[in-house]
Amino acid sequence: MKSGDVIRKLEKAGWKLDRVSGSHHTFKHPAVAAIVTVPHPRKDLGKGLVRQIEPISGVNLREG
C-alpha cells in the first residue's frame, strides 16, 4: 500500500497533519489520544506497519 493512500484515508477519517520531521508525517485526531506516524513518500509500506496503524487510528486501511 502506498503511503499517499494511507494518508488520504487517515485525513478522510478526521486525522490532521500535526508535524513533519524529515520524511515522517505525524497525524493527530481531536477525539483520539494517540498519534500516527507515516513515512512519506514511500511507494510501499510494509504489511506490518499498516497492521499497526489500523488499531491505533481506528481506520481500516486495507479495505478498498
Regions found by a protein language model. Give the residues of each.
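Major-groove DNA-recognition helix of helix-turn-helix-type DNA-binding domains
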Residues: 13-29
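C-terminal structural segments of small proteins and small subunits
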Residues: 12-13, 30-64
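Short linear Ser/Thr-Pro motifs
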Residues: 3, 21-23, 57
